């Protein structure tokens, strides 16, 4: 730091945080969440759901089924709703758009949504991220000007 010129601004940032989870739902195990689903992707707290049929009605039906089952435990939206609400920012890169599921489920509280085929591995992790809690979505930033 001795060699850094006076007046230099120093910015230190961090990654988002993680939470410990208490509740686990295995998608499709003792629940109807795999109805009409082709592939489950994303993080256990932020699932991208790809459907066997990609039509406006199929997206609405799947989002409704997931929301009715999960209730307040998750935010469930169609791709179009996510974009319209700026969930991924005000401008969505076409590459990101291609990767989004037809339906997106973002866990709340201490919930994870485990893929039935990977439940053992995903469920073994203690810390998770990707939900809408403050600790998972805020990134720290410290700034100073060196004198």
Predicted feature descriptions by range:
Residues 1-147:
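Feature captures the catalytic ectodomains and active-site-proximal regions of enzymes
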């Amino acid at each position: 730091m001795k060699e850094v010129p006076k007046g230099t601004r120093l910015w230190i940032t961090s990654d988002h945080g993680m939470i410990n989870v208490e509740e686990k739902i295995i998608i499709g195990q003792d629940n109807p969440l795999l109805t009409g689903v082709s592939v489950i992707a994303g993080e256990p707290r932020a699932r991208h759901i790809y459907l066997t049929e990609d039509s406006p009605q199929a997206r609405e039906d799947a989002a409704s089924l997931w929301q009715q089952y999960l209730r307040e435990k998750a935010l469930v939206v169609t791709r179009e709703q996510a974009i319209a609400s700026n969930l991924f920012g005000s401008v969505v890169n076409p590459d990101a758009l291609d990767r989004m599921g037809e339906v997106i489920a973002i866990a709340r509280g201490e919930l994870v949504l485990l893929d039935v085929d990977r439940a053992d591995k995903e469920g073994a992790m203690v810390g998770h991220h990707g939900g809408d809690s403050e600790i998972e979505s805020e990134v720290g930033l410290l700034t100073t000007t060196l004198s």
